[in-house]
């Protein structure tokens, strides 16, 4: 199975020496802004006059803003052609029905959760799935995408302890 999303994340991390989505967006000259204009829209990205923009709703927690930034970075890195036509708006992250959203979620999980951190932390047999997520400062939903990525790449020691909730960030 193709590893292009994981490889694209690792190439970006090697080049810029960071996994921080905001630092990566800055290094790529992407304009990032927060807005209070939307009640349900988490974020979106678009291309205008050869400049990429990421807009993130300011009602989100810092953790959610980081996930949305990584997700939108995924769109910029993986879906440039689609961005030339129309903005990508994300009212619900973790959407499994739309391939572009699915890919952006995998990108965000691979960016924010390094394989080594997951492998090291998951060796602690005292941690259940939710404790693992808490220890790695992530959501169970994003961890599900990371585990799926690991399994897809042949890491059979992992299993999916919960189903992916495509409406996770859509809940208030």
Where are these regions (language model features)?
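Active-site hotspot residues in diverse enzymes, especially metal/ion-binding acidic/histidine motifs
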Residues: 1-172
